[in-house]
């Protein structure tokens, strides 16, 4: 049994919620009507120049997703993209038990051939297109050169905790990994090597992917 005051309070709340939902629908309809108008204009106005990434940091990841999430666009300065990727890999190549985590996303399009993504610990690299072929990256690699002091050591048995998905890789790709990793929905235009010069490696997950030339499992179990 509810007293009259409680019933009135519930009704008031319901009316307020209905108004909020109605307001939200109006905003959605307005946005849908406004979006086509945003695409209008001359061909010259629709062209996108190379962007300085420093103006995009706040917009794309610092405020929305946190400082360790990067969303790149084909219109970004290739040099800055490459420098950012290199800096992340320098931190994460041997960061086996570190606390840092990185998510690197590429918007659909074809990226400059100077951009190479090396994937270290606790790093996810992904394309944001509907299909893997919507996002074309020249090169992506995961090598096994960090374990022990000998640079000729190619043991990938500790290359854990990383992944790549939903993109097209336009050259030969090395993905020398072990457990707790994934490669899925990837188109490799060249050959795919699942080892680093036949060094030890064991595990990994590969699915829904296509290789144009060959997939060399090598020493991979």
Region locations from a protein language model:
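Short, Lys/Arg-enriched N-terminal segments with co-localized hydrophobic residues
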Residues: 1-17
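Bacterial N-terminal signal peptides that target proteins for export
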Residues: 19-27
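C-terminal motif of bacterial Sec signal peptides marking the signal peptidase cleavage site
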Residues: 37-39
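Right-handed parallel beta-helix/beta-solenoid
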Residues: 49-83
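Predominantly polar beta-repeat domains that present long G/T/S/D/N-rich surfaces used to bind, process
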Residues: 52-57, 64-65, 183, 188, ...
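N-terminal extracellular ligand-recognition/capping segment immediately after the signal peptide
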Residues: 70, 74-124, 130-133, 140-142
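Feature marks extracellular polysaccharide-active and adherence modules
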Residues: 107, 126-131, 138, 165-170, ...
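Parallel beta-helix/beta-solenoid
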Residues: 126, 150-172, 179-188
């Amino acid at each position: 049994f509810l007293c009259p005051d409680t019933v009135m309070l519930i009704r008031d709340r319901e009316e307020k919620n209905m108004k909020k939902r109605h307001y939200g629908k109006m905003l959605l309809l307005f946005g849908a009507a406004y979006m086509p108008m945003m695409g209008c204009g001359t061909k010259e106005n629709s062209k996108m120049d190379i962007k300085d990434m420093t103006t995009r940091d706040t917009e794309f990841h610092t405020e929305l997703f946190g400082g360790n999430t990067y969303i790149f666009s084909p219109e970004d300065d290739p040099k800055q993209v490459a420098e950012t990727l290199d800096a992340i890999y320098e931190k994460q190549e041997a960061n086996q038990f570190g606390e840092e985590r990185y998510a690197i996303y590429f918007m659909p399009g074809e990226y400059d051939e100077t951009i190479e993504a090396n994937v270290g610990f606790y790093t996810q690299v992904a394309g944001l297109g509907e299909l893997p072929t919507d996002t074309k990256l020249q090169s992506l690699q995961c090598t096994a050169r960090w374990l022990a002091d000998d640079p000729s050591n190619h043991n990938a048995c500790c290359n854990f905790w990383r992944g790549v998905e939903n993109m097209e890789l336009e050259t030969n790709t090395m993905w020398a990994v072990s457990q707790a990793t994934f490669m899925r929905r990837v188109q490799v235009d060249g050959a795919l090597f699942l080892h680093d010069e036949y060094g030890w490696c064991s595990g990994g997950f590969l699915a829904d992917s296509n290789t144009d030339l060959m997939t060399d499992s090598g020493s991979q179990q």
